[in-house]
C-alpha cells in the first residue's frame, strides 16, 4: 500500500499508549487526541506549496515564504471534532468542510447524513480527519463525495487504522495518501479495530 504513511515518533507512541488505556478519563482522552493530531499534521503537510514574499523585519527587508496551498479540513462527524482544533492551530487560515457519517449498529456500515463544504472547496487541498480507520467504508464514501464535488487534492489523517480497511481503500483510491499513527492487528466480528481504543466518539464526548 504505497499510499499509506505510518507516522512513527516516540511522543506519538507514548501518547497512544495512554489513549488506548480503558481507564483514561474523557478529559485526558480529548487532550491526547488533540496532541497526537497536532503532531501528525506536520508530516501530512510536509509537501504543501509555498510562495515567496518580501518581509520587513525591524532590521532589514528579507525574502520569506508563506503557504500557497489553500487547505480545507474535513472532519468526519462526530469523533473527528476532537482533532479539529489542533489542525486549526497549525493552519489557522484553513476552511472547514463538514462530513456527517453515522455508524449503523445493525449493518456496521456508515450512513451519510450531512455535508457542508466551503464555496471554493474545489480549489483547496482537502485533509479528511477521523481518529479511526476501520473498514474503510466511511473513508471511501467521504472521498467519493469530495470527488463528486470537484475536489481533486485529498489526504486522509487517522490516528489508528485496521489493515483490512487500508487495503480496501487503497485498491479504490491509490492516489489518496493516508497518514496514520498505528496500523493495528485486525477487525473483529463487529468491525471494531483490535486492539484499538474502543469507540473514539463516545470517549471524546463522554457518552459511554
Swiss-Prot record:
Binding site for uracil: 193, 198-200
Pathway annotation: Pyrimidine metabolism; UMP biosynthesis via salvage pathway; UMP from uracil: step 1/1
Cofactor(s) required for function per UniProt: Mg(2+)
CC cofactor note: Binds 1 Mg(2+) ion per subunit. The magnesium is bound as Mg-PRPP.
Keyword check for Protein biosynthesis: no
Record: residues binding 5-phospho-alpha-D-ribose 1-diphosphate: 78, 103, 130-138, 199
Chain coiled-coil ranges: none
Summary of activators and inhibitors of this protein: Allosterically activated by GTP.
InterPro entries (alphabetical): PRibTrfase_dom, PRTase-like, Upp_B, UPRTase/APRTase, Ura_phspho_trans
Catalytic reaction list: UMP + diphosphate = 5-phospho-alpha-D-ribose 1-diphosphate + uracil
Catalytic activity, EC: 2.4.2.9
MF GO annotations: GTP binding; magnesium ion binding; uracil phosphoribosyltransferase activity
Summary of the function given for this chain in its UniProt record: Catalyzes the conversion of uracil and 5-phospho-alpha-D-ribose 1-diphosphate (PRPP) to UMP and diphosphate.
Name recorded for this polypeptide: Uracil phosphoribosyltransferase
Amino acid at each position: 500500500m504505497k499510499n499509506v504513511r505510518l507516522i512513527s515518533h516516540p511522543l506519538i507512541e507514548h501518547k497512544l499508549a495512554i489513549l488506548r488505556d480503558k481507564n483514561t478519563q474523557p478529559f485526558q482522552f480529548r487532550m491526547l487526541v488533540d496532541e497526537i493530531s497536532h503532531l501528525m499534521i506536520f508530516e501530512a503537510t510536509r509537501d504543501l506549496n509555498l510562495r515567496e514574499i518580501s518581509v520587513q523585519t525591524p532590521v532589514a527587508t528579507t525574502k520569506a515564504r508563506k503557504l500557497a496551498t489553500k487547505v480545507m479540513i474535513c472532519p468526519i462527524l462526530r469523533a473527528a471534532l476532537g482533532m479539529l482544533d489542533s489542525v486549526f492551530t497549525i493552519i489557522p487560515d484553513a476552511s472547514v468542510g463538514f462530513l456527517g457519517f453515522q455508524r449503523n449498529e445493525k449493518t456496521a456500515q456508515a450512513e451519510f447524513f450531512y455535508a457542508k463544504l466551503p464555496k471554493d472547496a474545489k480549489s483547496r487541498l482537502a485533509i479528511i480527519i477521523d481518529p479511526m480507520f476501520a473498514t474503510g467504508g466511511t473513508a471511501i464514501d467521504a472521498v467519493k463525495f469530495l470527488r463528486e464535488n470537484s475536489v481533486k487534492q485529498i489526504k486522509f489523517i487517522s490516528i489508528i487504522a485496521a489493515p483490512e480497511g487500508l487495503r480496501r481503500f487503497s485498491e479504490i483510491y491509490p492516489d489518496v495518501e493516508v497518514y496514520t499513527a498505528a496500523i493495528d492487528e485486525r477487525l473483529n466480528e463487529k468491525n471494531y479495530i483490535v486492539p484499538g481504543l474502543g469507540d473514539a466518539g463516545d470517549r471524546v464526548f463522554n457518552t459511554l
